[in-house]
Amino acid sequence: VSRGLGDVYKRQVRNFTARGFLWYQGESNIFNYYCYAPMMTAMVQLWREVWEAPNMPFYYVQIAPHKYKDSQDTDAALLREAQIKALEIIPNSGMVSTADIGDEFCIHPPQKDVVGLRLATLALTKTYNICGLPSTGPTMTKVNYSEGKAIVTFDNASALSLIHI
């Protein structure tokens, strides 16, 4: 990311006050998923430098399921994986999922209020330390394979219900 770009941003935002960043982008990156995490990390570092806040919270939305034109079936999944990787390498960051509200034919989930509520809840718990709010959804932590079955372990899954098929 260009240092000059940071100087331009700094001049434009220096009189504003911010407590954190909310970010929803990535659909156009499904074809370059392999560099998404380092690019987003560099962007967050630049923004934090511009705001002179090296630990300012950065919360973002994982892309929703969608049938992307001209893409392999795995491209969007690989981008979602890259977004999880970014979560692991960007300090003081958080991610909300839209896996349950995606639309095959609409690139952005139609339920914007749900996305906003999830981001707000994440910020309230992580930035403002309000306890008792469900700020993250189920996160897969482990998979074991045994006798032709996959046993999947999740964190944050107390409200998760499963259907045996």
Regions found by a protein language model. Give the residues of each.
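Alpha-helical scaffolding within the catalytic cores
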Residues: 6-12, 41-46, 74-84
